């Protein structure tokens, strides 16, 4: 019941949860999941953006498509989309990484690709992916221990 909002449509939080499952499926099919357990690695989402175009209504059958679209020195860029009746409903771009679960540090993509025997992959980000990634680098992030104004709607 938490998947559906007041208008009998899938809520945006559930869409991201289903996209999590799509990335897990990609990890299993690519052989990455076995390497995660073997090397004590973890998956992390470092950034995401999503576009919504059509509603997903109660009882709609959805298809999720997940694909790796780019790799740089540190990040794997994944595009995910949800489809109903052959039409895209939403599309997300995610900047993801593989971490050492002991240290929490993001591993270089070359190290991960080498473990998967994909040593010669060359998938630089397209201009639109790079523009999003670059813009995200200059986006301000909240500072620790900074309290909101007293008239703010959100309080601690």
Q: Where in this protein do the model-derived segments appear?
A:
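HotDog/MaoC-like acyl-thioester-processing domains
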Residues: 56-61, 68-156
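Short, basic/aromatic beta-hairpin or loop at an interaction surface
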Residues: 34-43
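Charge-rich alpha-helical segments
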Residues: 29-32, 101
